Amino acid sequence: MKQKHLFLILAAVLLASCRGDDEVLVPSTWTQVAAPAQPRSVTGFYLLNEGNMGSNKCTLDFFDATTGYYRSNIYAETNPDVVLELGDVGNDIQTYGSKLYAVINCSNFVEVMSKADARHIGEIKIPNCRYIVFHEGYAYVSSYAGPVQVDPNARLGYVAKVDTATLEVVAECTVGYQPEEMAVVGGKLYVANSGGYRVPDYDRTVSVIDLATFTETKKIDVAPNLHRIVSDSYGQLWVSSRGDYYDTKSDLFVIDTRTDEVAGRLGIAVSEMCIDGDELYILGSEYSYTGGNGWDVSYAKIDTETRTVVSRSFITDGTDKEIQMPYGLAVNPETKEIYVTDAKSYVVRGTLYCFTPDGRKKWSVANGDSPAHVAFLKKGEG
């Protein structure tokens, strides 16, 4: 769940930890969006639709590259015995081994499914869970720890260590305030801390956790309200700051993991990013309460070796003008196709766009509310 423009409305929101009220959801549909293919490695992907906060409308879609069919809202039909389906606000989705993990933020659990068919396996109870990464048989889940509400006295967050064989939480490590995305590099877990509930007193640090001892060893001062973090092949971390939505703008920073110090600043807004080889793709949907109270949108690409912006718009055919609110971003590691989701108003069905590697629209398809997170499936995994 990204920071949408009604940030302060969280102060009035108290959400139940159960799966929410009964909803009439969009039924499963099949749409032919592409020609059947014979991929070498990537056979398709799952897409997690967040659903609007409080609506209990998180849904799961699947694209089968071998048939070219896109199937929406598959979870309910696949798991008819699961009460009230996926839950409230799907915040992340990843695969590891034979399992598919969906982080359901406002329902306070991680849904664990079979990667092969999305059948329910179990749940991992973690309050206000945010994102998930994996390393050597363990899942690491960031947690705000407290309820979903703006609170200047909000407690420190933590990272839960989960045994992927038993789905049990085996340890917790306290980090900064309202921790977000994480990345593993060289036996260390790096955690971007936002402090988003403590507005305007945001956190501005990246926590460094030694995975051997599962203890925080350092905090790296970066910028206010951190969010995204990804690693590249050069031992660098790319960390985004949302800024404060007033005078301090969203920005992108580089951390050298050999020294655990900030090594660069790009001066570019980031709301979502993903890495493919030496290319870092960026969506910039930056909101400001000053300068017109609106959104500034960009689609940039960065060379991670040289740390330079090589393109200010990776969409080259003008389709970007159709996209109301760019939200999710992914790049197929085999075909290099680029996927961008449009959340529109956040309370209506969104759209997924597929672009060729050179930025031309290939196809689009309707999704659920706030389509956001993609997990690719590869042959031979799990």
Which residues are covered by each model-predicted region?
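C-terminal motif of bacterial Sec signal peptides marking the signal peptidase cleavage site
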Residues: 14-17
